[in-house]
């Protein structure tokens, strides 16, 4: 959690926006995950969101669903994800890593047992897509005790009552879903409506606010970052990595995809 707080404080002090790439652990291969994470940092990533493969990713569009299926087919379960973070930490002790996934694998593992293992591996936060904020108190308490941030999600359809709850309990950063849909549906992105909401959230939230869903290139990243503390890019990056033939190709694709977004954010 402290790595996330430090990174956003550092960015704020330098007048920069956070660039947060999402990749699925285990895709395009088990061997590529950690090298791709390092490549993303070289290309300008400030935080890495690492997707935990799940058999029923309801919030994800076809690109990430297929990515998750491929990763599961290779055996990329929760243990693999934590080992990947542990390996990443051998060379990078500074870049925050947030796991994004669903409740079921964690509940099977045991929430406290998982949380302790995640911290030991070097994880900084969790974004649990299907954990309602009204039911998050126990999980948040366990995570806070061990030093994990429970990242919250808000969307255009989130009620004012729920927004008040999310803003008052936000840890790490608040992830604003720029439209009501699944990941990758960039045709639904309305930057004007999202910008209005982002400005409101930044005034209310006790943590930085980042925007995700529908960000696919440098132009959309720069547009969304104007009124946010950072942006998350996922499906477009996952699609680019899916075409990689080997680890070297995956690294090169990761850097080639992310570097223009970093440049656009720094010039905006």
Curated annotation (Swiss-Prot):
Question: Main EC class of this protein?
Answer: lyase
Per the UniProt entry, the Enzyme Commission number(s) are 4.2.1.20
- Where are the catalytic residues? 49, 60
A Pfam family recorded for this sequence: Trp_syntA
Q: Does the keyword Amino-acid biosynthesis apply?
A: yes
| CDD domains membership | Tryptophan_synthase_alpha (cd04724)
- InterPro entries recorded: Aldolase_TIM, RibuloseP-bd_barrel, Trp_synthase_alpha_AS, Trp_synthase_suA
GO CC field: cytosol
Instruction: State the pathway, as annotated in the record.
Output: Amino-acid biosynthesis; L-tryptophan biosynthesis; L-tryptophan from chorismate: step 5/5
MF GO annotations:
tryptophan synthase activity
* Entry keyword set: Amino-acid biosynthesis, Aromatic amino acid biosynthesis, Lyase, Tryptophan biosynthesis
Q: Its catalytic activity?
A: (1S,2R)-1-C-(indol-3-yl)glycerol 3-phosphate + L-serine = D-glyceraldehyde 3-phosphate + L-tryptophan + H2O
Q: Does the keyword Amino-acid biosynthesis apply?
A: yes
Q: What does this protein do?
A: The alpha subunit is responsible for the aldol cleavage of indoleglycerol phosphate to indole and glyceraldehyde 3-phosphate.
UniProt family annotation: Belongs to the TrpA family.
Query: What is known about its subunit structure?
Result: Tetramer of two alpha and two beta chains.
Q: What is this protein called?
A: Tryptophan synthase alpha chain
> What gene is this protein translated from?
trpA
């Amino acid at each position: 959690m402290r790595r996330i707080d430090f990174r956003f404080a550092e960015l704020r002090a330098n007048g920069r926006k956070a660039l947060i790439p999402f990749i699925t652990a285990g895709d395009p291969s088990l061997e590529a995950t950690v090298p791709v994470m390092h490549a993303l940092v070289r290309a300008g990533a400030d935080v890495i969101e690492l997707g935990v493969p799940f058999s029923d990713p309801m919030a994800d569009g076809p690109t990430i669903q297929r990515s998750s299926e491929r990763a599961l087919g290779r055996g990329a379960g929760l243990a693999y994800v934590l080992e990947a973070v542990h390996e990443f930490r051998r060379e990078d002790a500074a870049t925050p890593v947030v796991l994004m996934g669903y409740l079921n694998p964690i509940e099977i593992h045991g929430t406290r047992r998982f949380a302790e293992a995640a911290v030991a591996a070097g994880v900084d936060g969790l974004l649990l897509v299907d954990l309602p904020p009204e039911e998050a108190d126990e999980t948040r308490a366990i995570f806070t005790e061990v030093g994990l941030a429970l990242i919250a999600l808000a969307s255009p359809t989130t009620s004012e009552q729920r927004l008040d709850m999310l803003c008052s309990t936000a840890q790490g950063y608040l992830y604003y879903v720029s439209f009501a849909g699944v990941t990758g549906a960039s045709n639904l992105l309305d930057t004007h409506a999202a910008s209005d909401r982002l400005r409101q959230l930044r005034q209310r939230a006790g943590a930085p606010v980042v925007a995700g869903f529908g960000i696919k290139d440098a132009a959309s990243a720069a547009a969304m970052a104007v009124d946010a503390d950072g942006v998350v890019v996922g499906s477009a990056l996952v699609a680019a990595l899916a075409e990689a033939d080997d680890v070297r190709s995956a690294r090169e694709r990761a850097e080639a995809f992310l570097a223009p977004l970093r440049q656009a954010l720094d010039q905006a």
